[in-house]
Every structure is written in C-alpha cells, then in structure tokens.
C-alpha cells in the first residue's frame, strides 16, 4: 500500500513546475519579481511582474511587512494607492506614462484624492502631466 502512495507523491513532485523569480529574457526583466532592500533599518519589499522589461498587472510595496503602496498597470496608465501606517488608504489616483525620445516618465494625471488616517477625504487635487492644476480642501462635517 505504501509503494503506490510513494510513487504517486514522487509523480506529483516531478510534475510540479517551479516558478522562477527575478528572471531576464533578452536582457529585459520578465515574469515575477521580488525586490528587497533595507534603508535606515526599514525593510522594503516590492512584488510584481514584468513583461519585456515593463511592469504589468498588480504591484505591491511593503515597509517592514506593512503595505505602503499598490499599483495596477494597464498600458500607459497606472492606478496607484498609497496607505497610512495603520493600513488606511492615504491617497489614490492615476499616473500616466509619457515618452519623449529616450526619456520616459510617469506623471500624476487627473483627479487624486487624499484621506486622513480615519479614512475621511480631506483634499482633492487635479493634475495634468504631473503639474498641479487645482486643489480643493474638503471641510470635515463629522464631529
């Protein structure tokens, strides 16, 4: 009885595919990437995916194990969310990729919303190619 079970487990182990991390294809980052570094005793980690050297899909950023930022890439746009140390949403908005020759830059674009640690909206800002166009402070009516 143990021999068939052992053979089955051996078959499962041999058929499992290993997911490679931090790989390059044609000298460009490709697939799942996990990057870690420490700065001033804070351990930072980012987890996401690259396709042909460009970040794609969802990325998450941590400081000492706590989420500090999430990004969702779709073509030349990226939906960004920043978080307070308590885990509450701090800011959210869109960035847009603009290429000029060899220069590539992500700019804040459209309306961004900023929240306090109690999750109340406190400021909205409107951006165009990274330039602040307008800002509106939200009066807190809660007491």
Give each language-model segment a name.
Residues 15-143:
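Glycine/tyrosine- and acidic-biased, solvent-exposed loop/turn segments at the edges of beta-strands
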Residues 1-23:
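Bacterial Sec-dependent N-terminal signal peptides
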């Amino acid at each position: 009885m143990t021999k068939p079970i052992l053979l089955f487990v051996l078959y499962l182990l041999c058929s499992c595919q290993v997911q490679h991390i931090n790989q390059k294809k044609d000298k460009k980052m490709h697939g799942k990437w996990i990057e870690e570094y420490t700065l001033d005793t804070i351990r930072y980690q980012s987890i996401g995916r690259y396709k042909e050297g460009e970040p794609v899909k969802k990325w998450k950023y941590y400081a000492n194990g706590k989420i500090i930022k999430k990004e969702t890439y779709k073509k030349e746009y990226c939906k960004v969310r920043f978080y307070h140390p308590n885990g509450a949403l701090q800011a959210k908005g869109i960035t847009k990729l603009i290429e000029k020759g060899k220069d590539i830059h992500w700019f804040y674009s459209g309306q961004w919303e900023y929240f306090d640690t109690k999750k109340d909206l406190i400021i909205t800002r409107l951006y165009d190619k990274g330039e602040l166009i307008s800002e509106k402070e939200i009066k807190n009516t809660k007491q």
